């Protein structure tokens, strides 16, 4: 989700704090389930505090320690290593922590595909990544091939022809190499990991490895912003569903801090209005947005 969605999602209004004063980097492996299950935390954080920070997904991989540059954030002294473990919370994290040296490396083509989608914008890249993870974890696709990647591009509503050109392009390759280099510079040894920096400060950044309670991420953001910040009201349920297109009852319940029973009562009302389709996958209930934009009020 980015600024382009402002017409659908009520973006935060200006405040006394500096706009987008924090830069966040989420280090992921698209084949790691924990990296998929952290997404509800990121969505909720963005909806409530998105005016204070920007976020980028960084695709990790095997990196060479000799490639690190002399960037001001490269030195370990400039990153405060906060929590280095993964905790199972809210029923999302299910496989425990995944150390870089133990994880199987993501196929090169998959990483290139994510970068190719991002060449059409961060919003396009995020939509493509989410669709790819749905195929991997809900359809049991362990090694996505070119055909599936093209299907993800189509399902994500990005320019498929442009995606085909970019898939093997020098631009996508360079973008992926930059991700690998940055992963090395930040000394990422566990995924998912979040690194926060103040955009206009030489102060140390904060790294949090693994998955924690939502309040932890909010507290870290407040610490970096250095002024009182207040959450924006969450958007109406229909707006969230249109923005995400496909989301589980569990994710929606987490975002709105409600029980699954409460959320599903509201979702079933939308189902009766033919705005969503209910899909049961792996003992979990998902909801697909099927209404046209003109149906929204």
Swiss-Prot record:
Protein species of origin: Bacillus cereus (strain ZK / E33L)
Similarity comment: Belongs to the SpxH family.
Compartment(s): Cytoplasm
Any single Gene Ontology cellular-component annotation: cytoplasm
UniProt cross-references to SUPFAM superfamilies, sorted A to Z: Thioredoxin-like
PANTHER family, sorted: CLPXP ADAPTER PROTEIN SPXH, GLUTATHIONE S-TRANSFERASE KAPPA
Protein's recorded name: ClpXP adapter protein SpxH
Signal sequence residues: none
A Pfam family it matches: Thioredoxin_5
Assembly and interaction partners: Interacts with Spx.
HAMAP family linked: Adapter_SpxH
Function description: Adapter protein required for efficient degradation of Spx by ClpXP under non-stress conditions. Interaction with Spx stabilizes Spx and exposes the C-terminus of Spx for recognition and proteolysis by ClpXP.
Coiled-coil portions: none
Keyword tags: Cytoplasm
């Amino acid at each position: 989700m980015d600024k382009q969605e402002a017409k659908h999602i009520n973006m935060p209004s200006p405040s006394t704090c500096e706009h987008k004063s924090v830069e966040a980097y989420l280090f992921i492996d698209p084949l790691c389930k924990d990296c998929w299950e952290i997404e509800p935390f990121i969505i909720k954080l963005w909806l409530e505090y998105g005016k204070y920070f920007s976020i980028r997904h960084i695709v990790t991989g095997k990196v060479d320690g000799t490639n690190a540059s002399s960037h001001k954030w490269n030195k370990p002294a400039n990153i405060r290593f906060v929590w280095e473990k993964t905790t199972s919370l809210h029923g999302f994290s299910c496989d425990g922590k995944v150390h870089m040296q133990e994880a199987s490396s993501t196929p090169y083509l998959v990483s290139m595909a994510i970068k190719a989608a991002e060449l059409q914008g961060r919003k396009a890249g995020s939509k493509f990544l989410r669709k790819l993870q749905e195929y991997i974890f809900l359809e049991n696709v362990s090694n996505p091939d070119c055909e599936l990647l093209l299907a993800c591009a189509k399902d994500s509503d990005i320019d498929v022809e442009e995606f085909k050109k970019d898939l093997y392009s020098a631009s996508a390759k360079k973008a992926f190499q930059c991700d690998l280099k940055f992963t090395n510079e930040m000394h990422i040894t566990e995924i998912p990991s979040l690194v926060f920096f103040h955009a206009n400060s030489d102060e140390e950044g904060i790294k949090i490895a693994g998955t924690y309670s939502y309040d932890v991420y909010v507290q870290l953001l407040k610490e970096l912003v250095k002024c009182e910040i207040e959450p924006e009201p969450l958007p109406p349920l229909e707006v969230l569903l249109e923005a995400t297109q496909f989301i589980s009852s569990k994710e929606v319940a987490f975002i709105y801090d409600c029980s699954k029973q409460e959320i599903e009562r509201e979702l079933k009302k939308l189902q009766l209005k033919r705005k969503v389709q209910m899909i049961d996958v792996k003992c979990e209930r998902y909801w697909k947005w099927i209404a046209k934009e003109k149906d929204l009020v």
